[in-house]
Amino acid sequence: TRLIMVDDIAYFQADNKYAVVMTAEGEALLRKPIRELLDVLDPALFKQIHRSTIVNLKAIASITRDDTGKGTVKLKSRPETLAVSQPFMTLFRNM
């Protein structure tokens, strides 16, 4: 067991019944599903961007959208990009 500070979290990714927390330093497995995390995370800091992904808004470097309406999130502290499904793109249109 290790303590991860909220500010260090880049995003959460669903992994079957669990969630993986991703930080700049690596990753850790949580024994909670994504839907339970949504109930306890601060909605001002964390937003669901896909059915399997919750992102820390402070960790976002940029958000882009293609011609089909699909979005992509580029992170400040991680090399991967995250897909934003169309239903969740409305969150960013209103920001």
Residue locations for each model-derived region?
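Conserved binding/recognition cores within well-folded domains
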Residues: 1-81
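Eukaryotic intrinsically disordered, low-complexity regulatory linkers and tails enriched in Ser/Thr/Pro
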Residues: 84-86, 90-95
